[in-house]
A protein has these predicted regions:
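Catalytic NTP-binding/metal-coordinating core of nucleotidyl cyclase/transferase enzymes
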Residues: 1-72
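Generic solvent-exposed, charged/amphipathic alpha-helical segments
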Residues: 35, 39, 75, 132, ...
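Short beta-strand->alpha-helix linker/helix-N-cap micro-motif
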Residues: 178-223
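Short beta-strand
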Residues: 48-52, 144, 218
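Intrinsically disordered or compositionally simple regulatory linkers and C-terminal tails
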Residues: 1, 163-182
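A short, flexible beta-alpha/helix-coil linker loop
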Residues: 15, 94-97, 187-192
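Catalytic beta-strand-to-alpha-helix segment of the class III nucleotidyl cyclase homology domain
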Residues: 58-165
Length: 223
């Protein structure tokens, strides 16, 4: 099922190093963060936890404004505690929902949010223009316009706003020396049944290719 949603992706900076240095401490910090910060703030800002990624979290909101408030509160609280450092990416767009169990979300909106998270500087939030346009004046003034950015595996440039600078050397940025690229372009279907079948094939192929590191892909949703 496809519907409009706000995808929020966050991860812990330097988590692999933390695990290598003291695994028990790293795991305890994550558990503490989930109990003391994530659960209360998701209740407060109406966020729906889709899944925990070990060192990160995939969350869906119905409101762009609430998603940004949640991100800013996370960063404020972890900075105050001084134990973890986060980066967050947020994008508003069409989201493909998989009922499960377990439930999941995927599609271009999830991919863009993931790229935004990866290019955010440590301790910052990067959001798309579609997210920014939904913010109130007080929220909007916290973000700097970083211009159109060409993101890895994303067919068209994305206008990005950030609370700080962007990490333009990130793996989330598209580079000229990248490996093989496959482009998925659908044909116009001749019937409603064929259209549904083609959409399912396209979505499943996109989901599969995005899990592979050795090949890049771009997906054109409409013929």
């Amino acid at each position: 099922m496809r519907s409009l949603g706000v995808i929020f992706l966050a991860d812990v900076v330097g988590y692999s190093k933390m695990m290598a240095e003291d695994e028990n401490r790293a795991l305890n910090l994550i558990r503490e963060f989930q109990k003391e910060i994530i659960r209360p703030t998701l209740d407060k800002f109406n966020g729906n936890m889709i899944k925990s990624l070990g060192d990160g979290w995939l969350i869906e909101f119905k409101s762009a404004s609430e998603s940004v408030d949640c991100a800013l509160e996370w960063l404020k609280l972890v900075k105050k505690q001084g134990k973890l450092e986060l980066r967050v990416g947020i994008h508003l767009g069409d989201v493909e929902h998989e009922e499960g169990p377990p439930p999941d979300v995927y599609g271009g909106t999830v991919n863009i949010a993931a790229r935004l998270e990866s290019i955010a500087e440590n301790g910052e939030v990067a959001i798309s223009n579609s997210t920014y346009l939904c913010l109130d004046e007080n929220q909007a003034r916290l973000f700097n316009n970083c211009g159109n950015q060409t993101l890895k595996n994303i067919a068209t440039p994305v206008e990005v706003w950030s609370t700080g600078r962007l990490n333009l050397g990130s793996k989330g940025m598209k580079r000229e020396d990248e490996g093989p690229l496959i482009s998925i372009k659908p044909f116009a279907a001749t019937s409603e049944l064929a259209s549904i079948f083609c959409k399912d094939v396209t979505d499943n192929l996109e989901k599969y290719l995005n899990q592979k590191d050795w090949i890049d892909s771009t997906v054109q949703k409409n013929p």
